[in-house]
Amino acid sequence: MIPYGRQDISEADIQAVLDVLNSDFLTQGPQVPLFEKTVANYCNAEYGVAVNSATSALHIACLALGLESGDWLWTSTNSFVASANCGLYCGANIDFVDIDSKTYNLSVVELENKLIKAKLENKIPKIVVPVHFAGQSC
């Protein structure tokens, strides 16, 4: 098997999961607001919101950025469907930017070319969702 990624799970991580499993709450218990506060502090943000999936997180991000019907969202052709669906959930138009053949990430050259064309057509995207393939940042 070709290893795609490796996890770094400590004994403390395992114990934290066991503590929740042995508690009265699997969801919406006291660990959730503690987690949200810890993440917010780490990110130097006022708030943090725990959600059930990256799909939900992307949807909330689109809502927070005011994405709506008639707007455009662009994302990578090499991604899970959530990268596009988050825009569809807001009624936006979806389009894709091709990938770089070496990194498999969204191509900066293709993005630039597409932005130039979109400006001429008055179809500049409100949001671009880059996808960091296999841990590589765009």
Where are these regions (language model features)?
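Phosphate-binding glycine-rich loop
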Residues: 25-72, 86-88, 96-98
